[in-house]
């Protein structure tokens, strides 16, 4: 098992531009904070209202940070976010796209939901299932990946603003991209899908001059798992006593390594602090 060298020169990020979907909370916000501190032009695209974005911008005052409301399940909304991110940068080009938007673990195996629908009948149609996990975590990431590979090819109008040609696409999977989960269906389906997208895409993104990597964090105590913690608590289980959470800082370090290390691309199995695995 190869160990990831996280020694990176943050100076290489100075002046670069990034779009982070899901950047208003959790790993996305922590990454935006770190990259802004490194001197990057960071656009946060998130479904949270503009007021939330304005509060984030106030908190990150002094950095080059832009906020745009974005529903990642909407193709048009994502195009708007990409165009705003490009216009925000002096180079009028993007260097890094981080597809971090996601919704929390939705419990219930598909079999549970089928049984809950009752005995099969021909005179009544069953209600459609809740597939928001798949819509946001997989389709949304697919849209971001597609548009990232499309817009990352733009040449900077001002090469002096950022002369580096290195481009990076970072996809957000999870431990659910690798681990069986008989207690749920849509969340692991979405995360296995992101892993499949990564494994099929990484072989060819170099043709477009783009590096592609996958983050697959272990459980992290962020707002994303709040519903899971609540459900476990209702059963008398304290997740904090049963699990050792990975840290947000470790995930940010892994994301920054993917962004800054020009040699890191679609690498065979790497494990980094329960956080990065390909």
Swiss-Prot record:
Keywords: Acetylation, Cytoplasm, NADP, Oxidoreductase. It catalyses: (1'S,5'S)-5'-hydroxyaverantin + NAD(+) = (S)-5'-oxoaverantin + NADH + H(+); (1'S,5'R)-5'-hydroxyaverantin + NAD(+) = (S)-5'-oxoaverantin + NADH + 2 H(+). NADP(+) binds at residues 25, 27, 48, 71, 187, 191, 220, 222. This is 5'-hydroxyaverantin dehydrogenase. The keyword Signal does not apply. The modification N-acetylmethionine is found at residue 1. It is found in: Cytoplasm, Cytosol. Its EC number is 1.1.1.352. It comes from Aspergillus parasiticus (strain ATCC 56775 / NRRL 5862 / SRRC 143 / SU-1). Pathway: Mycotoxin biosynthesis; aflatoxin biosynthesis. GO terms for biological process: aflatoxin biosynthetic process. Disruption phenotype: Cells accumulate 5'-hydroxyaverantin. The keyword Coiled coil does not apply.
């Amino acid at each position: 098992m190869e160990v990831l060298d996280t020694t990176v020169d943050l100076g290489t990020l100075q002046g670069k531009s990034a779009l982070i979907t899901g950047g208003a909370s959790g790993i996305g916000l922590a990454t935006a904070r770190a990259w802004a501190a490194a001197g990057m032009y960071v656009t946060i695209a998130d479904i949270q209202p503009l007021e939330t974005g304005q509060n984030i911008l106030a908190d990150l005052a002094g950095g080059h940070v832009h906020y745009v409301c974005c529903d990642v399940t909407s193709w048009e909304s994502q195009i708007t976010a990409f165009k705003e991110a490009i216009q925000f940068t002096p180079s009028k080009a993007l260097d890094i796209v981080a597809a971090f938007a996601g919704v929390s673990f939705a419990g219930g195996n598909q079999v549970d939901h089928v049984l809950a629908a009752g005995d099969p009948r021909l005179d009544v149609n069953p209600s459609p299932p809740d597939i928001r996990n798949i819509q946001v975590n997989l389709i949304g990431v697919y849209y971001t990946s597609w548009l990232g590979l499309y817009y990352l090819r733009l040449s900077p109008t001002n090469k002096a603003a950022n002369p580096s040609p290195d481009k990076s696409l970072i996809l957000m999977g999870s431990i659910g991209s690798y681990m069986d989960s008989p207690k749920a269906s849509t969340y692991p389906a979405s995360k296995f899908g992101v892993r499949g997208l990564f494994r099929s895409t990484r072989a060819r993104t170099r043709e477009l001059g783009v590096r592609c990597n996958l983050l697959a964090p272990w459980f992290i105590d962020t707002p994303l798992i709040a519903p899971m913690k609540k459900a476990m608590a209702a059963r008398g289980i304290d997740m904090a006593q049963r699990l050792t959470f990975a840290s947000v800082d470790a995930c940010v370090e892994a994301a920054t390594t993917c962004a800054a290390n020009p040699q890191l691309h679609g690498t065979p199995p790497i494990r980094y602090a329960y956080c990065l695995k390909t």
